[in-house]
UniProtKB/Swiss-Prot annotation:
<keyword id="KW-1003">Cell membrane</keyword>
<keyword id="KW-0139">CF(1)</keyword>
<protein>
    <recommendedName>
        <fullName>ATP synthase epsilon chain</fullName>
    </recommendedName>
</protein>
<dbReference type="GO" id="GO:0005524">
    <property type="term" value="F:ATP binding"/>
</dbReference>
<dbReference type="InterPro" id="IPR001469">
    <property type="entry name" value="ATP_synth_F1_dsu/esu"/>
</dbReference>
<dbReference type="GO" id="GO:0005886">
    <property type="term" value="C:plasma membrane"/>
</dbReference>
<keyword id="KW-0066">ATP synthesis</keyword>
<dbReference type="GO" id="GO:0046933">
    <property type="term" value="F:proton-transporting ATP synthase activity, rotational mechanism"/>
</dbReference>
<dbReference type="GO" id="GO:0045259">
    <property type="term" value="C:proton-transporting ATP synthase complex"/>
</dbReference>
<dbReference type="InterPro" id="IPR020546">
    <property type="entry name" value="ATP_synth_F1_dsu/esu_N"/>
</dbReference>
<keyword id="KW-0813">Transport</keyword>
<keyword id="KW-0406">Ion transport</keyword>
<comment type="subunit">
    <text>F-type ATPases have 2 components, CF(1) - the catalytic core - and CF(0) - the membrane proton channel. CF(1) has five subunits: alpha(3), beta(3), gamma(1), delta(1), epsilon(1). CF(0) has three main subunits: a, b and c.</text>
</comment>
<dbReference type="InterPro" id="IPR036771">
    <property type="entry name" value="ATPsynth_dsu/esu_N"/>
</dbReference>
<dbReference type="Pfam" id="PF02823">
    <property type="entry name" value="ATP-synt_DE_N"/>
</dbReference>
<keyword id="KW-0375">Hydrogen ion transport</keyword>
<comment type="similarity">
    <text>Belongs to the ATPase epsilon chain family.</text>
</comment>
Amino acid sequence: MAEITVELVSVERMLWAGQASIVTAQTTEGEIGVLPDHEPLLGQLVENGVVTIQPIDGEKLIAGVSGGFLSVSKEKVTILADFAVWANEVDTASAEADLNSDDELAKARAEAGLRAVRRSSEGL
């Protein structure tokens, strides 16, 4: 099976690095899927989007991201997000409460996290 090296990094931490069979991300140009040997590209991630990674040896990983960039070369995908959180790390009650916050950063992070949770529950 063909594979591609993937790194998902936020301002706060490295979320994941490893080999994957496909990566999808929501960019300002639309949702894209990246397979091994993809043509090089640079894309801007949408605010409050979702990134999915299918590792070669495990279950699909789903993260909510807010802003940043996606860089693709023949051998590697690098996702540099302003904020990123795994769907399974999101406290949905707290995130839903943050949707009503006056703090725009907290609201954006809540939206990104809840989108990841929804995508995860859809099984896509």
